[in-house]
Regions:
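Membrane-embedded transmembrane alpha-helical bundles that form the catalytic cores
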Residues: 2-337
Length: 338
């Protein structure tokens, strides 16, 4: 975040702020400081500079905060404790079907964990009078890796594009250098998460996938939009390629990642014994990726206009419900380690 401020000043895109207090607030603004979303100086400082008071949308703030807590406690932590952690700790003891469900489960776990934190941060910022852009946009409905990165951790992907990919030359220096720039950008994006081979492989998979997609588009030309069935096929293929990357992202090392992938060849005849919450989360979590955006906005808008007593009751009921449905204790957010 601070790097983008310095680079934007160097490029002449913004003027340095003359207020030390404004700069300190930009650098240390606590809601999104640890795990995003990454806020650009031009967006944050502009909100400090205006004299207009930002109306606080209580309904949207409650939706973001309570929704983020639900994603973390009920979705991410339940999937982790009841399915994902056990399989990734001992893949040799899991059936092929159980391993596949654990991989799917981790895809939903990391989405619930990370987007949940982003939603909470954006909601708290909104209560403090700051408006931040959404950081996730139903990423698993993407029909290509390029679209996935327009929907996943949007603030990071745009940061990598603007400050790494463009700085390397972007797509202005010919086809081969464009491929190189894509690959380097994603490799560095992987290393940003940690100096381990699992993150290198994760970044390389996404980089190679983006290169192949670009090569195919260049060979075929812009053409016409894919049919409905074509988009379904592309969406399924993209999701499974992303899941392959998540195996390396989640595994403690390359050997464990190989064991997880090898476990897919195990028995597929015996049904795994799953907690009912896991089954519901897998079904509902997958379905939610394709629901229309803003489906529940009218209800939250009504809540925002309701008396404080009504809002307090909803908050208490939601928290108690999450405590009942969630596991014992709350694990740290995944992105706190990066």
């Amino acid at each position: 975040q601070t790097m983008s401020y310095s680079i934007d000043i160097y490029r002449g895109r913004i003027e340095p702020t003359e207020s030390l207090l404004d700069f300190a607030l930009f650098v240390g603004f606590f809601p999104q400081l640890v795990a995003g979303p990454i806020v650009r100086a031009r967006d944050f400082l502009a909100q400090l500079a205006t004299d207009d008071r930002t109306p606080i949308d209580t309904g949207r703030a409650l939706r973001l905060i309570l929704g983020g807590l639900f994603k973390k406690i009920v979705i991410a932590d339940v999937l982790a404790t009841e399915l994902v952690d056990g399989v990734f700790a001992n893949p040799g003891g899991a059936t092929g079907l159980e391993t596949l469900l654990a991989i799917y489960g981790y895809a939903l776990q990391i989405y619930g964990d990370f987007s949940g934190y982003s939603d909470i941060a954006i909601g708290i910022a909104l209560l403090l009078g700051f408006r931040f852009s959404d950081n996730f946009d139903q990423p698993y409905r993407a029909a290509s890796l390029q679209e996935f990165w327009r929907r996943w951790h949007i603030s990071l992907s745009s940061w990598l594009r603007d400050y790494l990919y463009v700085s390397l030359g972007g797509s202005r220096r010919g086809r081969l250098l464009t491929y190189r720039n894509l690959l380097i950008t994603m490799l560095l994006g992987g290393l940003w998460h940690g100096a381990g081979w699992t993150f290198v492989v994760w970044g390389a998979l996404h980089g190679a996938g983006l290169v192949v997609e670009r090569w195919v588009r260049e060979r075929r030309g812009s053409g016409t939009a894919p049919s409905a069935m074509g988009r379904v096929v592309r969406t399924v293929a993209t999701f499974h390629l992303v899941c392959l990357g998540w195996v390396f992202f989640r595994a403690v090392d390359l050997e464990r990642a190989g064991e997880v992938l090898a476990a897919l060849g195990g028995s597929w005849t015996s049904a795994p014994s799953l907690d009912w919450r896991v089954v519901v989360i897998l079904v509902v979590g997958a379905t939610a990726q394709f629901l229309p955006r803003g489906l529940t906005d009218p209800w939250w808008s009504w809540l925002g206009r309701s008396p404080v007593v009504v809002q307090a009751v909803v908050v208490v009921v939601a928290i108690v419900g999450m405590d009942v449905l969630g596991p014992d204790g709350v694990a740290p957010f995944i992105y706190f380690q990066f």
